[in-house]
């Protein structure tokens, strides 16, 4: 049976359209290049992600309210919500992460140095936008996160407070520069 040319053309058109709409055909869409952040071998990898717009803020309340016994006198911080689909789906509680560098008084340094683990080969993973706030001539000591949480009075259960709960995940202290580097997360109800 021979198909006339008039019947063959519509079949080819349908086949071409169906092939173009095939969901199983791999697409080579150009992907957006990630923002080129500075690289610094002093720091561990920063693992938190967000869809929020990031902006370094110069403030101490973000540190001192979440870490009550820190006593920060100056600081630079990034706070953002986790990438959790909350923009398209309501979530009653929003999990956030915080990373920052803060100046602290000698009393805070003394409390933490007594409980330190020792010299660190890599500094805690902080967001690359904060690298410039960590002078290269400062030496840091790692503090166990469980010890830092206990000594500094963080409250991982305070989700209903104004600032939410907070738990330190990585922490280092510099006695010669009176700086701390912190990364942690919490929950806002």
PLM regions with names:
Residues 2-3, 48, 52-53, 57-58, ...:
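Mixed-charge, polar/low-complexity N-terminal
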Residues 123-189:
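Extracytoplasmic electrostatic interaction patches
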Residues 69-150:
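Mature extracytoplasmic domains of secretory-pathway proteins
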Residues 22-96, 100:
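N-terminal export/targeting and maturation segments
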Residues 1-9:
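Bacterial N-terminal signal peptides that target proteins for export
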């Amino acid at each position: 049976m021979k198909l006339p040319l008039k019947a063959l053309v519509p079949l080819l058109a349908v086949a071409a359209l169906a092939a173009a709409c095939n969901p199983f055909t791999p697409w080579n869409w150009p992907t957006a290049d990630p923002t080129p952040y500075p690289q610094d071998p002093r720091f561990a990898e920063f693992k938190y992600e967000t869809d929020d717009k990031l902006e370094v803020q110069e403030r101490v309340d973000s540190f001192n309210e979440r870490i009550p016994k820190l006593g920060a006198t100056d600081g630079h911080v990034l706070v953002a919500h986790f990438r959790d689909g909350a923009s398209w789906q309501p979530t009653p509680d929003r999990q956030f992460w915080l990373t920052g560098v803060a100046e602290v008084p000698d009393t805070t340094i003394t409390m933490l140095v007594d409980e330190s683990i020792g010299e660190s080969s890599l500094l805690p993973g902080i967001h690359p936008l904060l690298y410039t706030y960590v002078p290269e001539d400062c030496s840091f000591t790692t503090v166990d996160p469980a010890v830092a949480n206990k000594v500094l009075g963080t409250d991982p259960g305070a989700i209903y407070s104004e600032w939410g709960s907070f738990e330190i995940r990585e922490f280092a202290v510099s006695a010669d520069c009176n700086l701390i580097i912190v990364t942690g997360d919490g929950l806002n109800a």
